[in-house]
Amino acid sequence: MGSMKELLFEMQEERRDEWIAENYPDAEEGTPEWDAAAQEYSWFQDWMDEAAEQQCFEASLTSIPDRLQDAKAELDELESLMQFNQPRIVERMAYVHCVSVLDSFLMYSARALLSHPPHLHRFLQHASSFVRKDEKRDLLNRKWIEQEPEVDTPEQAYVWRAQALVAKMTFQNHKTISRYFSTMLTTPHEWPLQEIEGLIKIRNALVHRNGVNESLEPIYISQGSVQIAISTVRNFISVAAETLLQEDALY
């Protein structure tokens, strides 16, 4: 193991020396100029590593399998948390987070599908159903107003615009979920929307009315309530993911 570390260290030093020789040919090892160049190389490498990490993260946001794995991991973590007695406030927060996991999975999946031209064109065609008039105007603008107003909008810019609009949407309403995906998906599907309707209502009461429902009755969240919510969301995501992955595979 030690020899392998030494080999990697030597390779890193060689790459550093090559970079310095190319960018600072007059710098000699042991001089302040060489030390400054070595420090700049180190900063450059750190920046490259961070950029690569960010690029991988952004790519994962447009991958439905990655988003499914992330959602399942979040629910597993919540389930582990609920194996032990928790303060009431933690149980309430865990319940709310179940809906957040559902919301984010649907949003990122919808966003990911927009990378496919046929799906993007469907979004552009039905934009009036999803966004405000001013947002639709900017979305469909034939000029690339974000970068070069005199240039025609490239295809990828339409993708970015549509994805930005979807990223602002919330899928915490069963009617919104039904309207969006019934319009956008070509794959036949029947999702258990009724199962999440009550869960979302309780979530909204916890978030917006401090645990009081529309009938002005208090809502009590228990360990069992959270476990049921986790199971409900997990089941819905599994059913939805099957459809979304089939849709993704069409393109």
Regions found by a protein language model. Give the residues of each.
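Polyanionic, low-complexity intrinsically disordered segments
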Residues: 1-48, 55-59, 191-251
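Extended low-complexity intrinsically disordered regions
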Residues: 22-51, 151-177
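Helix-loop junctions and short alpha-helical segments
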Residues: 58-196
